[in-house]
Amino acid sequence: MIPSPQVKAVAATLVFSALLLAGISASTPRGRAQEPGDDEGDSRIQRGFEIAPVPLNLEGKDRALVGLGSYLVTIDGCNDCHDNGPAQEFVPGHNPFFGQSPKKINPATYLGGGRDFGTISGPPSPHIISRNLTPSTKTGLPEGDHTFEDFVMIIRTGKDFDHLHPNCSATITTNCFPTNRPNPPVDGNLLQIMPWPNFQELTDHDLRAIYEYLRAIPCVQGNYPGEPADRCS
């Protein structure tokens, strides 16, 4: 199967993410929390607040973690995939790829998911849709009401708790990954497209910061199949 332009673009994004995360991981051993008075850590926290594209709810949250999380989520380009597509990623007239400045992220779609990456094993098979990472207004938990422990497992192992696209062998539909192709077949228990094999090298402290930041951003209502209709109500 010849890769589609979308898959090629995703591959380029994954390579960039791998290089970026290699630099982050090399400077901070896994599990090491930021030390008090760490100038580099303090500067990242401050920069995170400066570049946050949406208002942040800091009530009941660790401010330093939120700032660091904002920094990591922004430089890792999480919104490049976890929005509703290129046409809605930026506020009209503020798209840097069109030479428009200042750059301004569209808060109405920020990390709300819904980008369609197409199929990865040929039809019939499911389209991979990026997930909504914003928090539920009912529980305050981000990324589909997942706890921090769930979030760590997702990033470390790629486990798909939602199990949106199981494997199938008998009746093949557009919602499941067939077990007879490709060879080896796609594992329906794992997230596809999402570059978790790169992100799994993030430190425990970095993952805590990212999760805390996702708790602090505004809820964005999902608009794609499988997304709860009442996330923000």
Task: For the regions a language model picked out, list residue spans one by one.
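The canonical Cys-X-X-Cys-His
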Residues: 69, 75-85, 122, 151, ...
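N-terminal secretory signal peptides that target proteins for export/translocation
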Residues: 1-9
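Electrostatic cytochrome c docking/interface patches
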Residues: 44-74
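Detector for the c-type heme attachment site
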Residues: 81-87, 156, 195, 215-216
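Surface-exposed intrinsically disordered loops and tails
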Residues: 41, 45-51, 88-123, 162-185, ...
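Electron-transfer interface patches adjacent to heme c in soluble/periplasmic c-type cytochromes
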Residues: 96-156, 160-164, 197-207
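Bacterial N-terminal signal peptides
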Residues: 12-23
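Boundary at the C-terminal end of the N-terminal hydrophobic targeting segment
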Residues: 26-33
